[in-house]
UniProtKB/Swiss-Prot annotation:
Record field: compositional bias (Basic residues): 1-23
Lineage of origin: Bacteria, Thermotogati, Deinococcota, Deinococci, Thermales
GO biological process, alphabetically ordered: translation
Subunit (UniProt): Part of the 50S ribosomal subunit.
Identification of the protein by name: Large ribosomal subunit protein bL32
Function: Found on the solvent side of the large subunit.
GO CC terms of this entry: large ribosomal subunit
Keyword presence, Transit peptide: no
Chain's gene name: rpmF
Length: 60
């Protein structure tokens, strides 16, 4: 039976938590559409009304 490598020392809570410090999720950034006030990602066509930069660019 083959032996596999195991940790020589127990990982401390501080080292474990420091490694996980970059794992947090960021909430999506949403802005209100100037035409219909629906929340949408910035710099994108509004999925509700189809407007972008004050012009109708998508038929909804």
């Amino acid at each position: 039976m083959a032996k596999h490598p195991v940790p020589k020392k127990k990982t401390s809570k501080a080292r474990r938590d420091a490694r996980r410090s970059h794992h947090a999720l960021t909430p999506p950034i949403l802005v209100p559409c100037p035409e219909c006030k629906a929340m949408k990602p910035p710099h994108t066509v509004c999925p509700e009304c189809g407007y972008y930069a004050g012009r109708k660019v998508l038929e909804v």
